[in-house]
Amino acid sequence: MAISTNKLFISGSRVSIMSLELIVPNEWNVIPRRTLETELLRIISAKQSVDQTTSGVIGFYNGIVAESRKLSGYLWFRKIGDHSKKPYVNWYQVMTIKPKESPATSSEDISSCSDCDSERLQSDDGCCSTCGEEE
């Protein structure tokens, strides 16, 4: 699976994203920012894996349904019923998503400690960063 816009590329479980520029309805602003970012990336990825496109993604948040379409390097979630060719400034806002690399693709060792059962990072010397016990 790969997602691409001007500034986004997702391939399989590996994420290489500089940023993703979206235009979203103002009504979606009531949702916590990180929650909305995570959900939008999830539905965009799902659509891309099926149709190899980021256009046509349907989002439904805070009672507002919108469908994505490409517009000058942005992915515009245009409200259903809005037939304008460009987003109205008072109806939409720009959202830049700069996702972080997932822990699964990180080079850091994330494992659990058998002594305290934490899932904290192991230090370079093999000691648990929570209890100090060696693995």
UniProtKB/Swiss-Prot annotation:
Biased composition (Low complexity): 106-115
Superkingdom to which the source organism belongs: Viruses
Annotated spans, Disordered: 100-125
Protein name: Uncharacterized protein F1
Taxonomic lineage from the root: Viruses, Viruses incertae sedis, Polydnaviriformidae, Bracoviriform, Microplitis demolitor bracovirus
